[in-house]
Amino acid sequence: MPEINTDHLDKQQVQLLAEMCILIDENDNKIGAETKKNCHLNENIEKGLLHRAFSVFLFNTENKLLLQQRSDAKITLPGCFTNTCCSHPLSNPGELEENDALGVRRAAQRRLKAELGIPLEEVPPEEINYLTRIHYKAQSDGIWGEHEIDYILLVRKNVTLNPDPNEIKSYCYVSKEELKELLKKAASGEIKITPWFKIIAETFLFKWWDNLNHLNQFVDHEKIYRI
């Protein structure tokens, strides 16, 4: 694996690069484990390295979507606006559990607490709804990138927020119209959004949003959307 100098990066974020992500093949079968650092190096991504991830979309009882702006300390895509929470299940027994995507949902609960300070008891795994999976690849810069099969998770609940400033620069709840305005700002270069959020917003998000009371029609645990 290539050696990358991380001396100039945020120390807390560098520590997280040692976490072990779940390596998978293109059909989401586990084939091993590798550090978060090696999973996100473009040099390895170009050789086909692929890992499991998730994206949470949390709506409050007013049907507004919780967005976050990634902190400037983040190694990949700093300062970008994105959906509620995006991260990775780790290669440990609790988060490797594949039955009903329980491991991924446990990981989402863990990261909602770590990033946004949402108490664990407010987002138990059984209240995190697994819709489908999306396979995508995108560069952050010349060194770092993303290559993931992303589990799409939806939550509908009012929650308590206490964000970690090392993870999150800002957050807001948005209506559909407010998100459309934000996407226009991103298209004009006024703000930055993450590539996976752009992809999901342009393809699936508004269909889900229009049908929050009828999400069963979008549940597909067999297909992996290649985007």
Swiss-Prot record:
Q: Where do we find the motif Microbody targeting signal here? A: 225-227
Q: In which pathway does it act?
A: Isoprenoid biosynthesis; dimethylallyl diphosphate biosynthesis; dimethylallyl diphosphate from isopentenyl diphosphate: step 1/1
| List of residues binding Mg(2+) | H40, H51, E146, E148
What the entry lists under Pfam families is as follows: NUDIX
Enzymatic reactions: isopentenyl diphosphate = dimethylallyl diphosphate
How many cofactor units bind, and how? Binds 1 Mg(2+) ion per subunit.
The UniProt GO MF terms for this protein read: isopentenyl-diphosphate delta-isomerase activity; metal ion binding
Active site (catalytic residues): C86, E148
User: Which coenzymes or cofactors are required?
Assistant: Mg(2+)
This protein's GO cellular component annotations are: peroxisome
Which terms under GO biological process does the entry name? cholesterol biosynthetic process; dimethylallyl diphosphate biosynthetic process; isopentenyl diphosphate biosynthetic process
Q: Which residues form the Nudix hydrolase domain?
A: 49-199
Provide the binding site for substrate.
K36, R70, K74, S87
EC number(s) from the headed UniProt entry: 5.3.3.2
Q: How does it assemble?
A: Monomer.
Q: Which PANTHER family match?
A: ISOPENTENYL-DIPHOSPHATE DELTA-ISOMERASE, ISOPENTENYL-DIPHOSPHATE DELTA-ISOMERASE 1
What name does the UniProt record give this protein?
Isopentenyl-diphosphate Delta-isomerase 1
